[in-house]
């Protein structure tokens, strides 16, 4: 979401993938991270960034999923397998939860960079 919203070089290809996906899911944690990153990168207030993220979510018909017991368990397992210091993927907390939400819900993980490419979801 951040790459598209802030016009990063990968924005066009990611936007195309969002448009082609059967369903695009996100969690409250990914929304929080996106709001924080958009506010920082675009030098706008959190309220402005939040409104922009909400518009993005509506435009792409993203479906908010809850982080429940299964997602939590998967995130912990992802941390054990792929965290910084243990694996070249170097997943951080937000990455582990994105991984867990995708894996638990049988969804394709839309990402940029090489971190997730080094996991079993690639």
Question: What do the predicted segments below correspond to?
Answer:
Residues 1-29, 41-55, 121:
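Short, well-structured N-terminal submotif of metal-dependent ribonuclease cores
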Residues 76, 121-122:
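Short Asp/Glu-rich motifs
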Residues 28-36:
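Short, conserved active-site loops that position catalytic residues or coordinate cofactors/metal ions
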Residues 63-108:
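Active-site neighborhoods of divalent-metal-dependent phosphate/nucleic-acid chemistry enzymes
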Residues 26-27, 91-92, 113:
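Histidine- and aromatic-rich ligand-binding microenvironments
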Residues 35, 39-70:
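Active-site-proximal, substrate-binding regions of enzyme catalytic domains
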Residues 110-118:
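Gly/Pro- and small hydrophobic-enriched strand-loop and loop-to-helix capping segments
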Residues 18, 58, 103:
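Anion (oxyanion) recognition and catalysis
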């Amino acid at each position: 979401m951040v790459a598209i919203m802030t016009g990063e070089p990968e924005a066009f290809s990611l936007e195309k993938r969002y448009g082609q996906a059967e369903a695009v899911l996100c969690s409250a944690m990914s929304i929080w991270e996106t709001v924080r990153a958009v506010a920082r990168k675009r030098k706008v207030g959190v309220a402005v960034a939040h409104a922009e993220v909400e518009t993005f979510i509506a435009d792409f018909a993203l479906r908010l999923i809850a982080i429940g017991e299964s997602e939590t368990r998967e995130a912990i397992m992802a941390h054990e397998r792929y965290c910084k210091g243990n694996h070249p993927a170097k997943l951080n907390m937000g990455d582990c939860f994105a991984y867990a939400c995708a894996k638990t819900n049988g969804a394709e993980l839309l990402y940029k960079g090489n971190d997730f490419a080094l996991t079993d979801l690639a």
